[in-house]
């Protein structure tokens, strides 16, 4: 009989069981950066919950109080889900993880639960599961981002996005990467940008986001933890291949300054 276990991680368990993403490359900079970030965020009550099937990692959910979230959303009093991932669909694993999050939020008297989705990238959770559980779409933002929310009562204020996305891009003329290690794949994404830039003889300004306030002020997308900007235009908010980056940058180099 299959044994299912939900394990709420802490620093000691992350050191032992390991975090979920990039676990096959535990010596990589991305994996080590993620674990360091997790240990810092555990002190701010971040929850990192893994689902084990017969002691094997098959899914996880990461969420935190919105006031400490890595998503550019105004949602004070809510829980914000960063990630939800399962290795197999149709087994109810996603529902179990989501229920864990919602139960925890209710027990802590939160206003509700919110999540950022985007159908055009796998870097955010799929919205299908949340719609199945009566989350409602409350806001949209450029680049196909959507904000889904499950409020616990009808009289609470709903979360919302900032509205100055375009203004956030205008100050960057040089090729610039804004990042934090909430996602371990940020390192690989960064390396691909650097490789493409090197082929074109471009220097890169790398900005490490150090705080929630800095994230809320500077990020040009709701995703928050990875943005590539050149000549006032967003190149990407997720990992691209070196060739894809090269083509995008080359197009901008050949166009008007």
Task: For every predicted segment, state its role.
Residues 91-106:
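Conserved acetyl-CoA-binding loop-helix of GNAT-fold acetyltransferases
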Residues 1-53, 164, 183-185, 189-192:
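Short amphipathic alpha-helix that is part of the acyltransferase structural core
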Residues 105-119:
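Conserved GNAT acetyl-CoA-binding A-motif
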Residues 164-199:
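Local sequence-structure signature of Cys/Sec-based thiol-disulfide redox active-site neighborhoods
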Residues 231-257:
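Non-catalytic, surface beta->alpha helical segment in thiol-disulfide oxidoreductase systems
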Residues 82-91, 119:
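A short, internal acetyl-CoA/4′-phosphopantetheine-binding micro-motif in the GNAT/acyltransferase core
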Residues 50, 56-67, 80, 85:
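Conserved beta-strand in the GNAT
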Residues 116-117, 134-148:
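Conserved catalytic-core motifs of GNAT/GCN5-like acyltransferases
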């Amino acid at each position: 009989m299959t044994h299912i276990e939900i394990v709420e991680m802490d620093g000691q368990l992350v050191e032992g069981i390991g975090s979920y993403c990039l676990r096959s490359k535990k010596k990589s900079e991305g994996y080590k950066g993620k674990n360091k970030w997790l240990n810092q965020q555990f002190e701010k009550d971040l929850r990192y919950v893994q689902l084990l099937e017969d002691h094997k990692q098959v899914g996880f959910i990461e969420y935190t109080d919105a006031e400490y979230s890595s998503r550019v959303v105004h949602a004070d009093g809510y829980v914000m889900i960063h990630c939800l991932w399962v290795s197999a669909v149709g087994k109810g694993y996603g529902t179990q993880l989501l229920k864990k999050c919602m139960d925890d939020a209710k027990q802590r008297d939160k206003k509700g639960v919110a999540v950022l989705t985007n159908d055009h990238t796998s870097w955010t959770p799929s919205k299908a599961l949340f719609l199945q559980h009566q989350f409602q779409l409350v806001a949209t933002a450029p680049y196909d981002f959507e904000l889904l929310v499950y409020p616990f009562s009808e009289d609470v204020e709903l979360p919302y996005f900032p509205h100055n996305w375009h203004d956030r891009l205008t100050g960057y003329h040089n090729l610039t990467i804004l990042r934090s290690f909430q996602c371990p794949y940020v390192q690989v994404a960064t390396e691909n940008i650097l490789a493409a830039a090197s082929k074109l003889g471009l220097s890169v300004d790398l900005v490490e986001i150090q705080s929630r306030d800095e994230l809320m002020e500077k990020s040009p997308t709701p995703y928050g933890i990875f943005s590539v900007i050149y000549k006032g235009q967003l190149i990407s908010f997720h990992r691209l291949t070196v060739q894809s980056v090269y083509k995008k940058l080359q197009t901008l180099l050949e166009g008007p300054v």
